[in-house]
């Protein structure tokens, strides 16, 4: 049985195994608190994320289970990787991952980025997305604060499964809205991996200009700002809108022509403008893919087709439509944690573990 130690961080009890020391707060998110710590086993600095009240509701339990499954499955240089996971005696869940030091949001607010950094960061984002999309996974909430960077400019995408659009907690997130694809924002249709390409395009534009491209005050204002730059969506896209209210709103907007992006990004390379134009397209099916983007001239300095891997197998989403009670999610989560630690246990043993707590 692991020995646990307690510390108070931001008024919250952090209860971790004695393997970790020197806890320092890094940040508070919507669903968890993140601290840096020293892993005494590897002598490396790590990030420890406490998931707040993971078993308080079936929705939160399912969200936590989804994030755990994704972290276990996704293994790529440009995706955050799991190095440990445990449930504390107080029944909080802790994910331990690499510590990268900063994120793209902090970098963008501190200084303008030089061309070679923009290219290298975008290359790594698209390299990570190629892998993630090949696994049948859509991030759904890609934004600068979800893109971690270290002092060597190594980049990793994080917070997978954290923001399902159906989660009511996410609807008010201004930072999320800036990067959200039109088909999600206006609930046009079932969305797919293309939403991440739109978000990456918004991030690319922000790296080029140093400020958010579409800083909408709300969804209506957001869509209006998008059409000011990209013009009115084509009729074949408008006709896919299922919601009558949304359709009425879009048709009520004044007709606008798409503006040449070179007029807005006057200092950007023509190849950067060309790639950005291929990413910010209303019709999801006409957006460039991550694989295609990696072959684009703008990313040529870093492109290596022999070192841009895809997932060995698709992620298993079979649990995603399940409507289960908290205790069942808890047992499933405990089973996943035991599997991660290569511990064999029967379903009965797992159930007895929880009934005994």
Swiss-Prot record:
Modified residues (Phosphothreonine): 171
UniProt motif (TXY) ranges: 171-173
Domain called Protein kinase: residue spans: 20-299
Main location: cytoplasm
Cofactors that this protein relies on: Mg(2+)
Domain notes: The TXY motif contains the threonine and tyrosine residues whose phosphorylation activates the MAP kinases.
Family of the protein in this entry: Belongs to the protein kinase superfamily. Ser/Thr protein kinase family. MAP kinase subfamily. HOG1 sub-subfamily.
UniProt PTM comment: Dually phosphorylated on Thr-171 and Tyr-173, which activates the enzyme.
Localisation: Cytoplasm; Nucleus
Coiled coil: none
Activity regulation details: Activated by tyrosine and threonine phosphorylation.
Function: Proline-directed serine/threonine-protein kinase involved in a signal transduction pathway that is activated by changes in the osmolarity of the extracellular environment. Controls osmotic regulation of transcription of target genes.
PROSITE patterns reported in the protein's UniProt record: MAPK (PS01351), PROTEIN_KINASE_ATP (PS00107), PROTEIN_KINASE_DOM (PS50011), PROTEIN_KINASE_ST (PS00108)
Active site residues according to the UniProt entry: 141 (proton acceptor)
Gene3D superfamilies xrefs: Phosphorylase Kinase, domain 1, Transferase(Phosphotransferase) domain 1
EC nos: 2.7.11.24
GO terms assigned for molecular function: ATP binding; MAP kinase activity; protein serine kinase activity
Residues the record lists as Phosphotyrosine modifications: 173
Name of the protein this chain belongs to: Mitogen-activated protein kinase HOG1
One Pfam family of this chain: Pkinase
Residues bound to ATP: 26-34, 49
Catalytic activity field: L-seryl-[protein] + ATP = O-phospho-L-seryl-[protein] + ADP + H(+); L-threonyl-[protein] + ATP = O-phospho-L-threonyl-[protein] + ADP + H(+)
CC per GO annotation: cytoplasm; nucleus
């Amino acid at each position: 049985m692991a020995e646990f130690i307690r510390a108070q961080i931001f008024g919250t009890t952090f209860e971790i195994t004695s393997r970790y020391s020197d806890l320092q707060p890094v940040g508070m998110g919507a669903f968890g608190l993140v601290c840096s710590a020293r892993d005494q086993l590897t002598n490396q600095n790590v990030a420890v994320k406490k998931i707040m009240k993971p078993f308080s509701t079936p929705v939160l339990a399912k969200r936590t289970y989804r994030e755990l499954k994704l972290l276990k499955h996704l293994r790529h240089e440009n995706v955050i990787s799991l190095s440990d996971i445990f449930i504390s005696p107080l029944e909080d869940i802790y994910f331990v991952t690499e510590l990268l030091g900063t994120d793209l949001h902090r970098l963008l607010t501190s200084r303008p980025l030089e061309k070679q950094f923009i290219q290298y960061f975008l290359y790594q984002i698209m390299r990570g997305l190629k892998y993630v999309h090949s696994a049948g996974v859509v991030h759904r909430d890609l934004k600068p604060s979800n893109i971690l960077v270290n002092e060597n400019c190594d980049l990793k995408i994080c917070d997978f499964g954290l923001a399902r659009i159906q989660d009511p907690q996410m609807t008010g997130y201004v930072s999320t809205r800036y990067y959200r694809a039109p088909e999600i924002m206006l609930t046009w249709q079932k969305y797919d991996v293309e939403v991440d390409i739109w978000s990456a395009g918004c991030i690319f534009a922000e790296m080029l200009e140093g400020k958010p491209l579409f800083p909408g005050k709300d969804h209506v204002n957001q869509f209006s700002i998008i059409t000011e730059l990209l013009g009115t969506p084509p009729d074949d896209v408008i006709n896919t809108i299922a919601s009558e209210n949304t359709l009425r709103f879009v048709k009520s907007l004044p007709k606008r022509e798409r503006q040449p992006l070179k007029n807005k990004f006057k200092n950007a390379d023509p190849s950067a403008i060309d790639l950005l134009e291929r990413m910010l397209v209303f019709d999801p099916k006409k957006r460039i893919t991550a694989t295609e983007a990696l072959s684009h001239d703008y990313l040529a300095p870093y492109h290596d087709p022999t070192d841009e891997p895809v997932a060995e197998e698709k992620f298993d989403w079979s649990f995603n439509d399940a409507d289960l009670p908290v205790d069942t999610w808890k047992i499933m989560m405990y089973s996943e944690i035991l599997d991660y630690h290569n511990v064999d246990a029967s379903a009965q043993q797992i159930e007895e573990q929880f009934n005994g707590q």
